[in-house]
Structures are given as structure tokens and as C-alpha cells.
Amino acid sequence: MKKITVLALGLAAAACTQPQELPDNVMVTGTNPIITNQFTADPTARVFNGKIYMFPSHDIPSVITHVDGSAWFSMADYHVFSSEDLTTWTDHGVIVRQEDVPWGKPDAYSMWAPDCVEKDGKYYFYFPNTSKNGGFAVGVAIADNPEGPYEILPEPIEGIHGIDPCVLQASDGNAYIFWGNGRCAKLKENMTELADDNPRETVKWGPFEMEMVGVSCLQGLPSRQAEGPFAFEYNGNFYLTYPYVREDTEVLAYAMSKNPMGPYEYKGLIMAEHENDCWTNHHSIVNYKGQWYLFYHHNAFSPDFDKNRSAQIERLYFNPDGTIQEVKPTMRGVGPVKSSHKVHIDRYSHIEGAAIEYLDTTDYFKGWKTVFEKAGDKVRFNELDFGRKAPRKIVLRVRSSVPAELTITAGKTGNVSFPECPEWTEIELPMPFKTKGMQDLEIALVSGNNIEIDWVSFK
């Protein structure tokens, strides 16, 4: 970026500032997507030791093809991430690799959605992979810490043939594992084997028959191409949530029961199809510090290939009867954002007229910019924390071929102006008013056209 000193029109001198650097494995977001340097699909969120831990699958650019010859989902390992505030995320690195799975095919790239639970001080990480014997299986890796290191057991769980494991630790003292298209079975106390008293049934696929352990919890429910079951318990009810293809792409649906193994009664949608026709969605639901959250994925960093997905978060609410209110995806997300950080207003709460575009179409991880095309265009970014001390300056990373004036609103309202800066420039200007505490930030264009803003900050 070009470093220059510019003069703010009608105001004091404006100066360039240096962006604050973070360790490579730490990122500050608070907005969606929450991880901005790699793909993080199928996010399973769990609370351990007062922190949120997220165990996603790890999409990479496709290295395998589907049976129809098209590029396909490719996942070779698992990372684990943690956060204490849903804004600052730490990547603890790879915990399981496909080539380290004793029973798995080392080049299958089929490490789909995982899960992790804790029992008696041990952390049990459940993951699918393609078996060397063919077909999918679910393995277990065990650690003394959610961040690892994990020891992979030499054999998968006998009796499970599928992907997307989810383990429910129920109030009846038992643990239940769900997988595939909603199948469920009870686990032994050791958390690594299916219990001996699970029911068995013969399942038919066309001319083929197979004896399966457990029960099909989606029996009789809307479940076309269902996958990714996630089960949890709340206020005496068991919830089985799952993605399925209602028309052409996936929705997130749910059913309720008084018994962890069902039968379940269908209740409706948690989230409708993605507006951009991203084919899949996959999720988890967790209570953290008294608030329920929905973790899910979208292809925000891969608009041209919907098999590279990124984790996002929204707040989730229950009705008095225990049913779930439908969740709308947002760009603002849920994390608290400090005004002293780089505030990416392209992750807006509301927009009028302005456009959101990628900063670099050769590297989508660089994020987005907000383009104020004409006077009157505006964006609002909700819940920005200005702290206890009113900032004296506003910093903008902007690009503009003409001088511009903006109206800034955050509890109070004032205007700032800057000259043309045809290259990306960080401009520091006097804050036009004093404000403190939690405010909704609105930025509107007063004069100028095609003004591009990467981020704003206050100090």
C-alpha cells in the first residue's frame, strides 16, 4: 500500500497509520465468516473449560472428481479452533491427518464432518473416513486436552457405516451416536464401541439388504438426501437437527422427541436455503454463556465453487413451547467488535444503495470492500463497542479518484472529508464528535462517487 500524508479538507492534517499485526494462528473477526485464512466447513461447536471449541472439516481446492467427472469435496485433515468471545479465534493446528489413520485410505480426501465430546477428563474426537476395506467408517481419536495431541485408535467403530458422526450425552446417563442420514445407536461407557443392547434392523437399498445397528431417527420425516445429524437436549426435549434437500439445495430442519432414539416429530426449518444456491449447509447448535448459537457454513470465500465452505455463526432462539425460531443468515454475525479494531463495514447489518465487492478476485480470502457509488448510499454496522473513552480520530482505508465527504453516525452525527486517493490509502482524520459505549455505526456518502472503503477504525 502506498504511504502518503494527505490533508483532510477543512480539517486537520491526515496521516497514514500502520495496521496492527497478529500471530499467524490468531484472527480477530466477530463477523461472518469467522475464520478468514482457510476453509472451515461442517462446524461442530462445543464448550470445554469455559471456551468455545470449533471442530470443522477442512475443505481444500478439489483434488478428486465425482463419478460424473466434476470437481468434488476434498478434505485431508482436521484443525481445531477456540475462542473466549466469538471474535478472537485461535487455530491450534492440525489434530488428525488422513495419512495417519491406521484403518483409513490415506488419499481418500473424505474426512467429512467430525464431533468431539468430553468424558472423565478425556476428549473423544469422532471423524469419518474412507476405510481401506471400502465404504465409509467412523473412527475415534482420544486426547487429554481438546487442542490435542490426539491418539487415533487402530480400528473404526464396528457397526457404523457412514459419515457425519454426532455424539449426544443425554441426561439419562447414556451417550448416543448419530451418523449418516439420521441413524442412531447407544455407545458403551468406553465411548468407543456401540452398546450390545442396540436394536438391529435389515435395511434394503434396491436389490441389496444390510443389517444395521440402531434405529433410523428420520423415519417418516422430510429427509430427501438428508445428512449431517446434530442432536442436543434442552428443557426436557431432545432435538434432532439435520440438513436435507427440500428442492435443489439444502435447508436446516429439526424434529423433537422425549426420547433420544425417537420417534421424532418434525417441527420445521431452522434455516432456509442459501440465497446464492450454495448446495450444502451443515451445522451445530450450542449454548455459550447463556446464549444459544447456530454454527453453519456457506461458500462466502469461494463464490465460484460451492464445495469450499466457511463457518458462520448466528444467535438462535426458542419459543415458549420449545420450538426453534427460524434463523436468517447475516454478514454481521454475533461477535463483539471493538471500534479500535479494523471494522469491516462490508459485513453490514443494513445497506442502502452501496455495493459489496471482493477486494481481489484472485484471492477471495482478502475479503471485501464497500463501494459507495453515489450520494445517499449508506451502510450500518450494529453493536460496535467504542469503550469508555471517546476516540479522537477515525482511520479509513479508502480508495477514491475524487474528493469525498462522509456522514458518520454513532450515537451522534458528524461529517468527515478527504481528498482523492487513487491508490489504497489509510487516512487518519479528527473524529467529528465524542461517543462512548455500544453504538450502531452508520456511514453515508454525502459527496463523491464510487468511493471504496476496506475498513474503518477509531482511536
PLM segments and residue spans:
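Generic cytosolic/nucleocytoplasmic N-terminal low-complexity/intrinsically disordered segments
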Residues: 1-2, 173
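Sec-dependent signal peptide recognition
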Residues: 2-8
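Hydrophobic h-region of N-terminal signal peptides that target proteins for export
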Residues: 9-17
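Carbohydrate-active catalytic/glycan-binding domains of CAZyme proteins
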Residues: 16-459
